[in-house]
């Protein structure tokens, strides 16, 4: 009777260790992903934003991969997998886009920083 009890205990411990290792791997992969974003804004209010297709064309011609191109308010956001890709894209777009645009690089290192950025971007009115 003691042999099955030991096997059940060992099975429970190995299951717990396996669950812990799986959880740690998931947490590590989530922390390791560091996206980077380029924000393109017009300097003057009347200037139109470049369309996403022209941005895609410039980046593709230089072999720079990106995750997404999204318009938001009066800004065009381009998301990359790494800050190196974002820096290369910034250099390309600085050369190829006409003057009159601000191209800013934003590294999204953590979920907490993304939430703080969202809170800072929204205007809050009390009273």
Swiss-Prot record:
Tell me the outcome of changing residue 51 to A: Loss of activity. Decreases interaction with EnvZ
Please list every transmembrane segment annotated in the UniProt record, as residue ranges: 11-31
Similarity annotation: Belongs to the MzrA family.
MF terms (GO), sorted A to Z: protein kinase binding
Domain remark in the UniProt entry: Interacts with EnvZ through its soluble periplasmic region.
Keywords (alphabetical) are:
Cell inner membrane, Cell membrane, Membrane, Transmembrane, Transmembrane helix
Q: Which gene produces this protein? A: mzrA
Q: Where is the signal peptide?
A: none
Topological domain (Periplasmic) residues are 32-127
Q: What is the lineage of its organism?
A: Bacteria, Pseudomonadati, Pseudomonadota, Gammaproteobacteria, Enterobacterales
How the protein sits in the membrane?
Single-pass membrane protein
Functionally, this protein is described as follows: Modulates the activity of the EnvZ/OmpR two-component regulatory system, probably by directly modulating EnvZ enzymatic activity and increasing stability of phosphorylated OmpR. Links the two-component systems CpxA/CpxR and EnvZ/OmpR.
Membrane is among the record's keywords = yes
Q: What is this protein called?
A: Modulator protein MzrA
* Induction of synthesis: Regulated by the CpxA/CpxR two-component system. Negatively regulated by EnvZ/OmpR.
Which organism does this sequence originate in? Escherichia coli (strain K12)
Q: Which NCBIfam families match?
A: PRK10629.1
Location comes to:
Cell inner membrane
The record's note on quaternary structure and interaction partners says: Interacts with EnvZ.
Recorded GO CC terms: membrane; plasma membrane
Which residue spans belong to the Cytoplasmic compartment?
A: 1-10
Question: Pfam families from the entry?
Answer: SecD-TM1
């Amino acid at each position: 009777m003691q042999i099955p009890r030991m096997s059940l205990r060992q099975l429970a411990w190995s299951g717990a260790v396996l669950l812990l290792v799986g959880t740690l791997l998931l947490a590590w992969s989530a922390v390791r992903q560091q996206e980077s974003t380029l924000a393109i804004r017009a300097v003057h209010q009347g200037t139109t934003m470049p369309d996403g297709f022209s941005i895609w064309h410039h980046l593709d011609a230089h072999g720079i991969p990106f995750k997404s191109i999204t318009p938001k308010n009066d800004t065009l956001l381009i998301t990359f997998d790494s800050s190196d890709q974002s820096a290369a894209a910034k250099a390309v777009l600085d050369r190829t886009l006409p003057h009159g645009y601000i191209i800013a690089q934003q590294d999204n290192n953590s979920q907490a920083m993304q939430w703080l950025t969202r809170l800072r971007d929204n205007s809050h009115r009390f009273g």
